[in-house]
Amino acid sequence: MIEQARIEELRQKLNQYSYEYYVQDQPTVPDSTYDQLLRELTELETAHPELITPDSPTQRVGAAALDAFEKVTHDLPMLSLGNVFDETEIREWVARIERSLGRSTTYVAELKFDGLAISLKYEDGQLVRGATRGDGTVGENITQNLRTIKALPLRLRRNETVEVRGEAYMPKQSFERLNADRAAREEALFANPRNAAAGSLRQLDSSITASRNLSLFVYGVGVNTLSARSHSEAMLQLAELGLPTNKEMQTCETVEEILAYIAHWTMERSNLPYEIDGIVLKVDRYDDQEELGFTAKSPRFATAYKFAAEEVMTTVEEVDFSVGRTGKVTPRARFAPVVVAGSTVSYATLHNADFITEKDIRLHDQVIIKKAGDVIPAVVSVVVSERTGNEQPIEFPAHCPACESELVRLEGEADIRCVSPECPAQLVEGIIHFVSRQAMNIDGLGEKVVRQLYEHEAIRTLADLYRLDRDELLTYERMGETSVDNLLTAIEASKQNSLERLMFGLGIRLVGQKAAYLLAERFDSLDGIAQAEYEDILAIDGIGSKIADSVTKYFEHPEAQALIKDLAELGLNQQFLGQRVDQSNAPLAGKTIVLTGTLESLKRSEAGKRLELLGADVTGSVSKKTDILVAGEKAGSKLTKAESLGIEIWNETQLLEELAKYEG
């Protein structure tokens, strides 16, 4: 059959061109040629669906969206690695290896990719399963999403049966493009490529994953079915099979060679097209690995050196103050621009007056800054030895920088606030919060549009959003008929939201999404919440005294009462419709979770809120009732106690994986 022969020829050509482009980084044909051949193959397979095979290049995307990921038990556990943090610990690790073996040995040094660990299983050369690491023993089947990664061969170059381990990641360029697209749509940005990769691979719709331009590297075998007698030999064999391996791997005979490799990539990491967060060190020979064995959690023959956060010195040139939606006044330092962890930094938050006092930060000081988690700029310390005598204390304003009202510091709080109900900065930030996806979810009404409407005096309160005039909007810059009609349609649709969205959107201090849901569920209507006594609110499981106090005080204000009445007259639903998933059916319902230590990618408070939205009960102390402890850096006594009680422990990577899995 002529068509069958042509289809097979096209598949072979396309697979070879993909290998040259995505694995070898040496394309031999232009993109247009590849696209033309792929189009021809698609047309032939459409005409002859009986000839479609799972490893065809056309089958990377297109399966129906899943309802959930099935669980997968790894043939061999995917253990985590121990850590070393400096030269002394590296030397001690090498010495310990050689003492155990009674001789010197050869090591392999590899880049530690900052992505999501995966397992890939091939049978007779064909990809049959791809899974996440999960807890190391049980992961999730994400084969459908991994198939969309063009660097991943759907069929090996030989009919081998093998399980390999690797890391799926998002290249820096793809990450920047993704965030630029999200910013243009006024969607929340991903904090870093690792989070973006994890979230992309946990999409139930593989077409979304395909649009994210992920890639991957294979870094080892699981159950070893190869003839290789060492890790470095195995990597050569995997490359021969067409799998994407990393060319920067290096064998090392001495600790000095290991240290030189680390020093080189510490300096050069920012020049790579993908993120790395350290170096993996392994004993090369498999018989040596077998002799060294494992601890309960990790192999003795391998460890990971994690890069320290890059720190740079710069000058505090000025400090400005911004006002948030709750009136909190936040100081922000502006620096002489410096490059930190690959990008230019020119400012960082100084949090509050206590932070400034504690670190004794002054205008014109030389300060050390870093990026927390290689993402968020942060001031580490002041270089006191560089002071010249020209430094000046940072003075908090006595009056609001937005409305000139007198600022206050409430008892027991570190923050200084503007309490004026007429403060324009609070009004704008409050409206931005009100229309956000987590609150009223009004599509097309992002921060820029809100500020534009405020500048035109079209809105001054939340209620004004529902009085916007179509003809007037059409006179504004970048407001065409289609965008205006879509905006007004979205605003009108938001009137039907369930009460918990409105309650969260009001921006009451300390009332997050979970508290808003609990209040709406308990009192059924906005009037019910507004008239509730402090004791009634406090009686709700999950609502503390500070939230109860904040809610009752909010509804005592005449301005709040007038707003509620206004919104009701404009037709906004103020009843609980039960539209959100019952927390009892949430993925982490019934789980008691404690967070301890320092998290690099997000604050513990943010992590706690996100876990609560997934149904977890987040508490502050470890007990027999605790199900999971999330342990960040420098976790102390809570970690020790959790280990003694046999409680499940997540590191930060596992936390991010779980959040990405359920948040999509």
UniProtKB/Swiss-Prot annotation:
PROSITE patterns assigned to the protein according to its UniProt record, in alphabetical order: BRCT (PS50172), DNA_LIGASE_N1 (PS01055)
Needed cofactors: Mg(2+); Mn(2+)
Database matches in InterPro entries: BRCT_dom (IPR001357), BRCT_dom_sf (IPR036420), DisA/LigA_HHH (IPR041663), DNA_ligase (IPR001679), DNA_ligase_AS (IPR018239), DNAligase_adenylation (IPR013839), DNAligase_N (IPR013840), Hlx-hairpin-Hlx_DNA-bd_motif (IPR003583)
Organism superkingdom: Bacteria
Active site: 112
Alphabetical list of Pfam families matching this protein: BRCT, DNA_ligase_aden, DNA_ligase_OB, DNA_ligase_ZBD, HHH_2, HHH_5, Nlig-Ia
Protein name: DNA ligase
